[in-house]
């Protein structure tokens, strides 16, 4: 502090000092004036600088006048003490002026810190550590228990090197001030950042996907119904046109049918089965539509184009010369005849055996002596 004051005295520079204090704390603004000096002024800024006290130092004693002793006190080295009953001291600038030198003191409210917030972005390899509460803070970022970054600001950004760190590592954000300290630890998992980004996008837009599915299903259902209705209407129209264009039955058949229906009634015999009459669409009063001749003149059909003259036949190709006949093959020599087989000797003739004699019955007379009458047969039943 003495070195700073000597520097200010030599170069006539205004020094600014920040004080961080809590509620109901006594604040002492050190002047560190050791030499005898006259014309020491303590001022405070309220839109303009107003004088608190006018002092002078002699024989190591600082004597001041014209100041409110219920709010302030001035020590022997001309330091200003502010009592805690003054609630307007925060965010206020006090000024010490002596020997054409100036020192500005700014008093700020010191608040305790709470746990910070850690966020990360895998695609950018970025970790952000941000404070939640607290003043006059110090932020530290530890990766795998190693301090990698430090700042006095309210947030800290750090880009890690993916070649030095794995896809999964531990990040700790530490925040502290003169009152207390807090930290937050988080596991950084960037094994598949593309898949994770797709998952986040899907979770954020799941309601839009639901509405798209409903719209697609409704469109397909309506298209199917329209196709079915169109198919049925075309089929009915085609059937109606076929009935109109079909030729009427011949007159002889109609007369024959009328004759059969009116004049001759065939009564089936008891043994004849009753057969159903063949169905005819003309036995009912079905309206028959005929095409009315058009009143507009018909467009004449164009005459057919004349056939082109036939192309002349090409001249016949000359026949090739006949091939010479091959020389006849010589006949093979005849095979020698086998010697004749000798005839077998004739069989010896045996005389026939005599017939056995059958004796006649003694009571039968000979044929010549029997009376035989011829009976004429007219009918055989």
Curated annotation (Swiss-Prot):
Region of interest: 7 X 6 AA tandem repeats of K-[LP]-C-[PRS]-[PS]-[PS]: 305-334
Membrane topology: Single-pass type I membrane protein
Sequence repeat residues: 305-310, 311-316, 317-322, 323-328, 329-334, 335-340, 341-346
Segments crossing the lipid bilayer: 209-229
Keyword check for Disulfide bond: yes
Residues carrying covalently attached carbohydrate according to the record: 24, 73, 77, 85, 91, 104, 121, 133, 144, 176, 183, 189
Coiled coil: none
Cytoplasmic side: 230-381
Induction statement: Expressed in the late phase of the viral replicative cycle.
Top-level taxon: Viruses
Major subcellular location class: host cell
Extracellular side: 17-208
Protein location: Host membrane; Virion membrane; Host Golgi apparatus
Signal peptide: 1-16
Cellular component terms per the entry's GO annotation: host cell Golgi apparatus; host cell membrane; membrane; virion membrane
Keywords: Disulfide bond, Glycoprotein, Host Golgi apparatus, Host membrane, Late protein, Membrane, Receptor, Repeat, Signal, Transmembrane, Transmembrane helix, Virion
Disulfide links within the chain: 122-190, 129-173
Protein purpose: May play an immunosuppressive role by inhibiting lymphocyte proliferation and subsequently facilitating viral replication and generalization of infection. Responsible for viral hemadsorption, which may help viral spread. Increases virus replication in the tick vector at the step of virus uptake or replication in the tick gut. May play a role in the host Golgi reorganization to yield viral factories. May play a role in host cell penetration.
Subunit structure: Both glycosylated and nonglycosylated forms interact (via C-terminus) with the host AP-1 complex.
Domain notes: The C-terminus contains repetitive amino-acids that may function as a cell-penetrating peptide.
Protein family membership: Belongs to the asfivirus CD2 homolog protein family.
Protein name: CD2 homolog
């Amino acid at each position: 502090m003495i070195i700073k004051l000597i520097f200010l005295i030599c170069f006539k520079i205004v020094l600014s000092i920040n004080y961080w204090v809590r509620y109901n704390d006594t604040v002492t603004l050190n002047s560190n004036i050791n030499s005898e000096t006259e014309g020491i002024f303590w001022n405070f800024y309220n839109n303009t600088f107003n004088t608190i006290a006018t002092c002078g130092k002699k024989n190591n004693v600082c004597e001041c006048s014209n100041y409110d002793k219920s709010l302030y006190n001035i020590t022997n080295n001309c330091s200003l003490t502010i009592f805690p009953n003054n609630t307007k001291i925060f965010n206020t600038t006090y000024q010490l002026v002596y020997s054409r030198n100036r020192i500005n003191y700014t008093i700020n409210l010191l608040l305790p810190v709470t746990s910070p917030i850690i966020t990360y972005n895998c695609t950018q390899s970025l970790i952000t550590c941000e404070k939640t509460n607290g003043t006059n803070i110090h932020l530290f970022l530890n990766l795998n228990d190693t301090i990698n970054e430090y700042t006095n600001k309210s947030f800290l950004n750090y880009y890690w090197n993916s070649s030095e760190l794995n896809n999964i590592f531990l990040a700790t954000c530490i925040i502290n001030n003169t009152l207390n300290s807090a930290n937050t630890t988080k596991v950084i998992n960037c094994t598949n950042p593309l898949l994770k980004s797709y998952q986040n996008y899907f979770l954020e837009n799941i309601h839009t996907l639901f509405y798209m599915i409903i719209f697609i299903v409704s469109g397909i259902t309506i298209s199917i119904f329209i196709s079915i209705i169109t198919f049925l209407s075309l089929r009915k129209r085609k059937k109606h046109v076929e009935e109109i264009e079909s030729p009427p039955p011949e007159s002889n058949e109609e007369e024959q049918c009328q004759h059969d229906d009116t004049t001759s009634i065939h009564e089936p015999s008891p043994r004849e089965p009753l057969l159903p009459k063949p169905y005819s669409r003309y036995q009912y009063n079905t309206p028959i539509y005929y095409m009315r001749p058009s009143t507009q003149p018909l467009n004449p059909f164009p005459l057919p184009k004349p056939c082109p003259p036939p192309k002349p036949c090409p001249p016949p190709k000359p026949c090739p010369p006949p091939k010479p006949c091959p020389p006849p093959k010589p006949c093979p020599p005849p095979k020698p005849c086998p010697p004749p087989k000798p005839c077998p000797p004739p069989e010896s003739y045996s005389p026939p055996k005599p017939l056995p004699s059958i004796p006649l019955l003694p009571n039968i007379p000979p044929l010549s002596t029997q009376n035989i009458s011829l009976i004429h047969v007219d009918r055989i039943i």
